[in-house]
Amino acid sequence: MACILKRKPALAVSFIALCILLLAMRLANDVTFPLLLNCFGQPKTKWIPLSYTLRQPLQTHYGYINVRTQEPLQLNCNHCAVVSNSGQMVGQKVGEEIDRASCIWRMNNAPTKGFEEDVGYMTMVRVVSHTSVPLLLKNPDYFFKEASTTIYVIWGPFRNMRKDGNGIVYNMLKKTVDAYPDAQIYVTTEQRMTYCDGVFKDETGKDRVQSGSYLSTGWFTFILAMDACYSIHVYGMINETYCTTEGYRKVPYHYYEQGKDECNEYLLHEHAPYGGHRFITEKKVFAKWAKKHRIVFTHPNWTVS
């Protein structure tokens, strides 16, 4: 009897320790916790990620308007994973890590099918250039039916996004929401586009139009993500010095297609007299923002001093 009584405190302490361990694992990782429950014979336990209960009320972003409802975007994320389209993602095998983020952001028509091991399979927000909308419409079921929970944010100049019937891209989007009523498609307002141009001028001292350049989809992604996310982890984006570093890794411009070399494309755009993206200049700005916001870059790693 005395032996049993001595064991009870030890059992109680062990049980409490186990509960604390499970709670800690739940806080640290909402994804692998259900797998641990399976080990205890509860595979059918209904699981609600703790991060769902901790989320802040949705924040309204008035610079982005729903094509169907004409309502502004409501979005608020905790930890965001922003996945680059770069060939740097090939072979990284960080798909599971990416999918553990509260919100996964992708750009343009970058696919997940066939690349899940490297880039994950979930997408919550997809920021898309007006020039990439026709690429989405080549496979509309994949982007707007299978991925109906994804929020699409389309950016483009007023001439293509105008709502008076003369905006060629806006007309495409209107037809898309008619065909796919569950699709969540938002367009960037003219005022927000002007704001993004202003940020570029403030950060670089250069007028975007006068310098003959176009902002990249990455630029628009960062502008929105910094408003919507508490912290940001960027995967597969190179910094401004990468292409001049001896022995740098040569990769395709996109992870999902062979062809253009990433660094060649960056240098071509950076020095184009007209119509180019200032990718390298933008990366300098991103590094500056990382000093002020909770932003980290990996695969490859950035040193932000």
From Swiss-Prot:
Its main location: Golgi. Disulfide bonds join C80-C229. Its EC number is 2.4.3.7. Pathway: Protein modification; protein glycosylation; Glycolipid biosynthesis. The keyword Amino-acid biosynthesis does not apply. In adults it is highly expressed in spleen, followed by kidney and lesser in lung. Not found in liver and skeletal muscle. In newborns it is abundantly expressed in brain and kidney. Transfers the sialyl group (N-acetyl-alpha-neuraminyl or NeuAc) from CMP-NeuAc to the GalNAc residue on the NeuAc-alpha-2,3-Gal-beta-1,3-GalNAc sequence of glycoproteins and glycolipids forming an alpha-2,6-linkage. Produces branched type disialyl structures by transfer of a sialyl group onto a GalNAc residue inside the backbone core chains. ST6GalNAcIII prefers glycolipids to glycoproteins, predominantly catalyzing the biosynthesis of ganglioside GD1alpha from GM1b. This is Alpha-N-acetylgalactosaminide alpha-2,6-sialyltransferase 3. The lineage of its organism: Eukaryota, Metazoa, Chordata, Craniata, Vertebrata.
